[in-house]
Every structure is written in structure tokens, then in C-alpha cells.
Amino acid sequence: MNRFSTRLMGATATPPPAPPKARSNENLDKIDMSLDDIIKLNRKEGKKQNFPRLNRRLQQSSARQFRMRVRWGIQQNSGFGKNSLSRRGRVMPGKRRPYGVITGLAARKATGIRKGISPMNRPPLSDKNIERYFPALKRKANLLRQNEVQRKPVAALKRPNQLNRKNNIPNNFTRSGNKLSHQKDTRQATFLFRRGLKVQAQLNSEQLLDDVVAKRTRQWRTSTTNGGILTVSIDNPGAVQCPVTQKPRLTRTAVPSFLTKRDQSDIKKVPKGVPLQFDINSVGKQTGMTLNERFGILKEQRATLTFNKGGSRFVTVG
């Protein structure tokens, strides 16, 4: 009895923990639900329990990916669907990157430009705007300038002022038009000589040297003197050059003066020309009429013919 009483006392002293109402309600709901709905609910509960751990992992991996992308210049917008990247930045099998992917420094510039500024309201690229919006570019440009200044050779700075002038006239600038034309002729001569043409250039070298200082005219304004004449002789290999043999001449005996005919000078030679079918002068000789008389007769004949026919629209004036 004592043992039994002690057990009862212990049971009354420590009441059993009551189950939570929420679980009991859920269990009651699950009884009424179908099997598929119960499986879905269990999955959701499992996801909720594991969510904080997964969320922490995702945050760490996203931060690591962002660092790697910034370091290697990978485009941040990996995208979704066909061209999406996996968590490690690799292209998934069967998925390709688009052709217009911007990488490297261009991607950084593009992201910098896009931030907070619409493409319509972008400021023009001046020094002030570069300092304001792209300080990294400004620093890079300054570093490049410093490097260029350091690379300049010291020997160039020690040159005399006369050599450092930009407006120095070259030594060969004193060529005149005649000298240039002489060079042109020689070039033309070599061009023709290579093609089997013999060229004889008649050039007065002394005159050319004298005119170098005196004349400074342009090539197309030079006077046509004996300085630019070219005589070209073309070889004809088909023609056979044989030495001309002197044929024996037949010497005629002189005819005495009394045998020559004197009547040849008296006869008038008719000049050769186009033979006419009739004599023009014969027309006037045969008729003995003037042209006015002839046309007058024709007019009268025409008038009589028209009068005999009757009225006509034409009036002949005699």
C-alpha cells in the first residue's frame, strides 16, 4: 500500500506535460486531408526548419561570387532560363552564353554608367564629369601620363634649339622645278629602257645647276626649254639591216642640143582634172537667152495653163 500510495502522490505532484494545441489542431487537420496534401505540408515544414541554415549558405556563396565577378570582370547579370549560369559561374550543359556578353573593363564601365542615370540624361564625357562619375578612370589616365613623362628620353631635351624647331626647312627643299622635271625625265627614261626602248634625253646639266638657286617654281609651271625634250627610237627586230651595196650606174651619153625638140615649150598642156559630161558654156551659146527671159516664158506658160483649167487658188504675178 505504501508503494502504491507513493506512486499516486508522485503522479499528483508532477502532472504530465500537456501537448501543444497547435500540433493537435494540425494533426486533426491532417486527418481530414488527402495523402498528397499531407506530403506537401510535411515538405513545407521541412523547408522551414532548414531555411535559416540554407539562407546563411546562400548569403556566403553570393558574396563570394560577387567578389570573384568583380575581380575577373564577369558580367553580374547572369540571367535566367536558357543562358543562365550555375552557382559557380560555369555554363550549364546545354546552355550557351549570349553573343553580346560584355566582360572585363567594359562591364565595369557599363555598370558604372547605368547606376542612377538614364541613357537619355547622361552627361557628356568631359574632364569634370570623368572626375565626378568615373574617378577610377581619371586615376588610370593620370598614372599613364606620369609613365609617359618618365619614359621620355633625356637626350631629346639636351638638343640645341635649332634642331628642336618644328619649322625647320629640310635640306633637299631647295630643289627647283627644273631639277624635279629632270628627275621625272630620268624616271621615264628608265621606264622606257626596261621595256626595250632606247631613250636619248637632251638635258643641259650646267643650266639645271644654275637654275636651282634662281628659280623656285613648281613642277607644272616650268617653262618649256631644252631641258625636257625626249627623243624615243623604237627598235624593229623584224627589219633586216643589210649593208647598202652600191649598184653600177648606167651613164647616158649627152644628147646634142640640135637634136632636142624645140616645139615642146610651145604646146600648151591641158591640166588634169575631173572630166565633165557636157560643156557648161555650150548652154549659153546655143540659146543666146538670159535667165530672166527664160523664167518669164515659163511663168507665162503656167498662167495660160491655169486660166484654161478654170479658177485656181494660186495667183501668179507677172
From Swiss-Prot:
Motif position, UAP56-binding motif: 27-45
Job description of the protein: Required for mRNA export from the nucleus to the cytoplasm. Acts as an adapter that uses the DDX39B/UAP56-NFX1 pathway to ensure efficient mRNA export and delivering to the nuclear pore. Associates with spliced and unspliced mRNAs simultaneously with ALYREF/THOC4.
One annotated GO biological process: mRNA export from nucleus
Species: Bos taurus
Subunit structure: Interacts with DDX39B/UAP56 and NXF1; interaction with DDX39B/UAP56 and NXF1 are mutually exclusive. Interacts with SSRP1; required for its recruitment to mRNAs. Interacts with CHTOP.
InterPro entries (UniProt xref): FYTTD1
Pfam families in alphabetical order: FYTT
Chain residue numbers at which the record places covalent cross-link Glycyl lysine isopeptide (Lys-Gly) (interchain with G-Cter in SUMO1): 140
Phosphoserine modified-residue sites: 24, 61, 118
Domain of life: Eukaryota
Cross-link entry Glycyl lysine isopeptide (Lys-Gly) (interchain with G-Cter in SUMO2), positions: 261
Bias-annotated ranges (Polar residues): 163-180
Name of the featured protein: UAP56-interacting factor
Modified residues (Phosphothreonine): 14
Compartment annotation: Nucleus, Nucleoplasm; Nucleus speckle
Keywords: Acetylation, Isopeptide bond, mRNA transport, Nucleus, Phosphoprotein, RNA-binding, Transport, Ubl conjugation
Disordered: region residues: 1-27, 163-183
GO molecular-function term, one example from the UniProt record: mRNA binding
Modified residues (N-acetylmethionine): 1
Similarity section: Belongs to the UIF family.
Entry GO terms, CC: cytosol; nuclear speck; nucleolus; nucleoplasm
